[in-house]
Every structure is written in structure tokens, then in C-alpha cells.
Curated annotation (Swiss-Prot):
The keyword DNA damage applies. Belongs to the SLX4 family. Keywords: DNA damage, DNA recombination, DNA repair, Nucleus, Phosphoprotein. It comes from Schizosaccharomyces pombe (strain 972 / ATCC 24843). This is Structure-specific endonuclease subunit slx4. Phosphorylated in response to DNA damage. Regulatory subunit of the slx1-slx4 structure-specific endonuclease that resolves DNA secondary structures generated during DNA repair and recombination. Has endonuclease activity towards branched DNA substrates, introducing single-strand cuts in duplex DNA close to junctions with ss-DNA. Has a preference for stem-loop (SL) and splayed arm Y structures. Introduces a single-strand cut in duplex DNA on the 3' side of a double-strand/single-strand junction with respect to the single-strand moving 3' to 5' away from the junction. One of its GO terms (cellular component) is Slx1-Slx4 complex. It is found in: Nucleus, Nucleolus.
């Protein structure tokens, strides 16, 4: 490959949006290209990802190189880490090639003609320039970590494949002090990655619930803070939970106490009514006869000369009033059974009459002699007694009243001794 063809990695965010444009490079140079191609398909988190674009331009004017970490964060040359000479490994220099296509097979098996033919000296010179850049260690750590957090929080869900590999990839780039700047959230993710391969939890659900139900904010915050993914002390969370439980139980106790007090007041009123009734019965004996007569007449009873009968009448009236008032208070008011039974009997009688009329009509129409049917068509009178006997011979026993109602319904002329 000529020296005019160069390698450039753009810093625009559109370059890293498509998965087909991302390539994973195994850091081995001194091997056959076929062996490199066979081992080139690796996990995204285990090595750097570099976007290579070839074009014909001045080779000396292009000194820009961008590394891409496992989560898709771009860092320019002036933001990269200052790698120490002890940590810099000349054997693990990446094999750079510039074969790009929409097809995945083209990416995994690049053409040898398009592969970049740069020796170790050129790569060492580029890495030495990156190494000599000042004040880039902390810049890379903060930019790599915080931009990752921003991209994740904007999508609403935090998803990462094996966070412990993310830490390894950062250490390959020289980020050994990431432990100091890492929040407890990433620590929890790294610890949970040992048991589960994928870690996923929602960030925006709490905000949505608080917007829908503002009154439930305190309970939501207490429950969310008790999760292992969020920051805080477990003891304080338990304390908040117990406080919420105490508040709930106190409110519930107050409601129950109010209902009990109301029920007690209701029972007191009933007891007072019973005591008043008993006191009235005791006072009836001391009432004069004229007053007892007035009370009995007020209830609609006839007056009597004997005081004992008047007392019994008044007592029975008072007992009836007390029982009725208690049944109303308890919701056991006596239903009007006689109305229900009467309506049921009426409906049953109507059904019987209609069924009997239908049976008579079927027998008349299906008879072989057609004597009754001919009389009906010629408007000749039918003897009711003879018609009743004729129906009995057809296995239909019907009373005279039902026969008369059938004749009245269908306009059949009748004759008989009942006139």
C-alpha cells in the first residue's frame, strides 16, 4: 500500500452508530494474516474498536487517531492517556486494515491488498506521540465514564455486557485509576456480572410513576433507595421502611378506632332505647286509666274499662314499635312476601292458560274427523259439554272455564246448559 493512503478515524458520533462499521481487532502483528483473521471475531468488550477510513491525501497531515472503548465512547488523540513505558507493550500493537463493506464477511476477512502495510516502527512512533501528550489520564477517565453514563441515562435503561470486561478493556488503555472515580452503581454492576451475563434495570420508571402519582413519591423513593443498584446505606433504608410502616399502621389504627367509637355510640343509643322502653313499661302501672285510654286510642285500638287490658295493649304497641325500629337499623326490614307470592301465582296461572289454549288448538287441527274444525270455519255453535267430552277422548282433560276462555279468545260460538 502506498504512503499516500493513510488511516483516519473520524470523531463525529455518526461513525459509530452502525454495527457493520465497527471492527474488532486482535492485537497480534507477527502472525500470518489468515491466523489473525481466524481470531479476529472476539467480544466487543475485550479489545479496542477502531474505525478506519482510507482516502488519497497527504500522509504527513494526518496524525489523528481515535480509540473506541467497549461501550462506544470516542476519545481524540489529545484526550488519550499518557501510557508509561513500562505499561506499553510493543507486541500487542493492533493490526490495522481498511477493508470496509456492508457485508460482515468482508469485515472479518479483509483483502490483503487493502491491508495497511505499516511496520512496527511507524506504530511505535505514533504511540510515543500519544504517550507524550500531557494531562490526559484523568481526562480520559472522566470522559469515558461520564459520557457512558449520559448515553445510558438518555435511553432510559442501563445495559452492559459483562462489566468486568469493561474494566479490563479500560486497564488495557492505561486507566488503572478508574477505581477511584467509579461510583457505587458501577461497582454493583461489576459484582452482579459474576452471576448474570447481562445486567438491565430501568431508570425512568420512577420518574414516570412520580409524575402520575405525586402523593406516592415518598414511598417510591424509599423503596427505590432500598435496591442494591442505588446508592445509600441499607440501615437508613430499613429505618425509612419501618417509619412508613409505622405511619400506615397508625393511620389504620386511627380509622379502626373511629369506627369502633361510632359503633359503641350506636350500641349506646340502642341501649338507651331499651332502657327507655323498660322504664315506660314500669311507669304504665302508675298511669291513670284515662291516660292509658288516650294512648290506646292513639294507636287505633278501642278503649276498655279495665286497666290491665289497657296496659297489655300499650305494652304490645311499644314492643311492636321497638322490634320494627331495630329491624330497620339492622337492615332486616320484613319484605312484602304476600306481593311476591301473588305475582308468582298470577304468572304461573297465565302460563297454564296459554299452554292449555295451545293444546286445544293442536288437538282440533290435528283431528282426523275435522268435525270441530268444520264447525269453527262455518261459524256454527259448539256445545261446550260435548266439546269437553271430545277432548277427553283425545287424552286432554280440560275444565269448562278453560274451554270458555279458549272460545272467547279465538271467537268460537258456544252453546250449552250454562246459559
Amino acid at each position: 500500500m502506498s504512503a499516500e493512503e493513510y488511516i483516519e478515524v473520524s470523531s463525529s458520533p455518526d461513525i459509530f452508530t452502525d454495527d457493520d462499521d465497527m471492527i474488532t481487532i486482535e492485537p497480534e502483528l507477527n502472525k500470518n494474516p489468515k491466523d489473525c483473521n481466524s481470531k479476529r471475531k472476539r467480544s466487543v468488550t475485550e479489545c479496542c474498536e477502531i474505525r478506519l477510513i482510507t482516502s488519497k491525501c497527504d500522509f504527513e497531515s494526518t496524525q489523528q487517531l481515535v480509540h473506541h472503548n467497549c461501550t462506544g465512547h470516542k476519545v481524540h488523540e489529545h484526550n488519550l492517556n499518557a501510557v508509561d513505558e513500562e505499561d506499553f507493550d510493543t507486541e500487542n500493537l493492533p493490526l490495522l486494515f481498511s477493508s470496509f463493506s456492508d457485508n460482515e464477511s468482508d469485515i472479518l476477512e479483509p483483502d490483503l491488498n487493502t491491508r495497511v502495510a505499516e511496520d512496527n516502527d511507524v506504530l511505535l512512533s505514533r504511540y510515543s506521540k500519544i504517550k507524550n501528550s500531557a494531562s490526559c489520564r484523568n481526562t480520559f477517565e472522566h470522559s469515558a465514564y461520564h459520557s457512558n453514563r449520559e448515553e445510558i441515562s438518555s435511553s432510559g435503561f442501563y445495559y452492559h455486557r459483562k462489566p468486568q470486561l469493561f474494566e479490563k478493556s479500560l486497564e488495557k488503555l492505561g486507566n488503572k485509576s478508574i477505581e477511584a472515580n467509579r461510583s457505587p452503581l458501577i461497582k454493583e454492576l461489576c459484582e452482579s456480572a459474576n452471576s448474570t451475563e447481562n445486567v438491565c434495570f430501568s431508570v425512568s420508571t420512577v420518574d414516570e410513576i412520580q409524575q402520575r402519582h405525586p402523593s406516592a413519591g415518598h414511598s417510591i423513593d424509599s423503596t427505590c433507595q432500598s435496591n442494591s443498584f442505588l446508592e445509600g446505606d441499607s440501615a437508613t433504608h430499613k429505618k425509612k421502611k419501618t417509619d412508613n410502616i409505622k405511619e400506615f399502621t397508625s393511620c389504620e389504627f386511627n380509622d379502626r378506632s373511629r369506627t369502633l367509637l361510632n359503633y359503641a355510640g350506636y350500641m349506646d343509643t340502642n341501649k338507651n332505647a331499651d332502657n327507655e322502653a323498660k322504664s315506660l313499661k314500669e311507669k304504665l302501672e302508675n298511669f291513670p286509666v284515662e291516660k292509658l285510654r288516650a294512648i290506646a286510642e292513639s294507636y287505633g285500638f278501642k278503649s276498655s274499662d279495665s286497666k290491665a287490658t289497657l296496659i297489655k295493649i300499650v305494652e304490645s304497641c311499644l314492643d311492636a314499635i321497638d322490634s320494627r325500629s331495630q329491624s330497620k337499623k339492622l337492615g332486616k326490614e320484613t319484605p312484602h312476601d304476600y306481593l311476591i307470592t301473588s305475582t308468582k301465582t298470577v304468572l304461573e296461572f297465565d302460563d297454564i292458560v296459554t299452554q292449555t289454549h295451545r293444546a286445544i288448538s293442536q288437538v282440533v287441527k290435528q283431528a282426523k274427523d275435522n268435525s270441530v274444525w268444520i264447525k269453527i270455519l262455518t261459524y256454527s255453535a259448539i256445545d261446550v259439554e260435548e266439546f269437553q267430552l271430545w277432548l277427553k277422548r283425545k287424552n286432554l282433560n280440560v275444565s269448562l272455564d278453560l274451554i270458555k276462555s279458549w272460545c272467547d279468545k279465538y271467537g268460537v260460538l258456544m252453546k250449552g246448559s250454562w246459559h
